[in-house]
């Protein structure tokens, strides 16, 4: 990780508690919803992507990606 700059997601008043599970979920759904809205152009969705990768464990993202691929993900926004 040498030379890689780590950043955490900025404060979001919708999620004031320390438990950031819902914040992680919201950024995952918001990122893929944004990409869907812009027809695959993820350059406009970078804020959601950075927050998602900062807050969510890689195992969760991987699991949700598998659910999306199998059309089992529990949100119609992605």
UniProtKB/Swiss-Prot annotation:
Cystine bridges: 24-56, 34-45
InterPro entries hit by this protein: COX6B-like, CX6/COA6-like_sf, Cyt_c_oxidase_su6B
Keyword Mitochondrion listed: yes
GO terms for cellular component: mitochondrial inner membrane; mitochondrion; respiratory chain complex IV
Classification via SUPFAM superfamilies: Cytochrome c oxidase subunit h
Subunit text: Component of the cytochrome c oxidase (complex IV, CIV), a multisubunit enzyme composed of a catalytic core of 3 subunits and several supernumerary subunits. The complex exists as a monomer or a dimer and forms supercomplexes (SCs) in the inner mitochondrial membrane with ubiquinol-cytochrome c oxidoreductase (cytochrome b-c1 complex, complex III, CIII).
Position of sequence motif Cx10C motif: 45-56
Protein name: Probable cytochrome c oxidase subunit 6B
Family classification: Belongs to the cytochrome c oxidase subunit 6B family.
Organism: Dictyostelium discoideum (Social amoeba)
Pfam families named among the record's database cross-references: COX6B
Lineage start: Eukaryota, Amoebozoa, Evosea, Eumycetozoa, Dictyostelia
Sorted UniProt keywords: Disulfide bond, Membrane, Mitochondrion, Mitochondrion inner membrane
Keyword NADP: no
Subcellular location: Mitochondrion inner membrane
């Amino acid at each position: 990780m040498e030379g890689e700059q780590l950043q955490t997601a900025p404060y979001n008043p919708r999620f004031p508690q320390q438990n950031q599970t819902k914040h992680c979920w919201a950024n995952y759904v918001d990122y893929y919803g944004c990409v869907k809205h812009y027809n695959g152009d993820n350059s406009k969705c970078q804020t959601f992507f950075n927050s998602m990768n900062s807050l969510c464990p890689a195992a969760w993202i991987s699991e949700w990606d598998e659910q999306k691929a199998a059309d089992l993900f529990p949100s119609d926004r992605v």
